[in-house]
Amino acid sequence: MSRTGTWLKMLVAGTVICVGGPAFVQSIRPTDEELFKRYNPDLQKRSLEEGDRRAREFDEYVTRLKQWSKSDKSIWFAAQEQQEQKRAEIESQRSQAKEDARLQREEMRKELLGEK
């Protein structure tokens, strides 16, 4: 067989593999609706209930990623800074709650001692 024939066969085989492979995978892959129908009823119900919440969480995450990407820093450093800010905020809320509880206890002691 001539070299041209060999090259032609290889081009045809490569085209079949490159085009036919993804087309075959696409044809056997189930759609989202087909996968959802395979769920048991409890999973279907839970999926429908949590779908909106998950979509909101994903949208919030994408929004945060966009904000982080606008800064000059790496996304990872920006995310770490935001986590540190949240931790500091939570810690300040805890300390404020502890202080309020301490003040309330002192007031209760004063009331009890004043009434005796």
Swiss-Prot record:
Keywords: Chaperone, Coiled coil, Membrane, Mitochondrion, Mitochondrion inner membrane, Transmembrane, Transmembrane helix. It is a single-pass membrane protein. Its main location: mitochondrion. Residues 87-116 are annotated as: Disordered. Residues 77-116 form a coiled coil. The keyword Transferase does not apply. Disulfide bonds: none annotated. Pfam families: CBP4. GO terms for biological process: mitochondrial respiratory chain complex III assembly. PANTHER family: ASSEMBLY FACTOR CBP4. Belongs to the CBP4 family. Essential for the assembly of ubiquinol-cytochrome c reductase. It has a direct effect on the correct occurrence of the Rieske protein, core 4, core 5 and apocytochrome b. This is Assembly factor cbp4. The gene is cbp4.
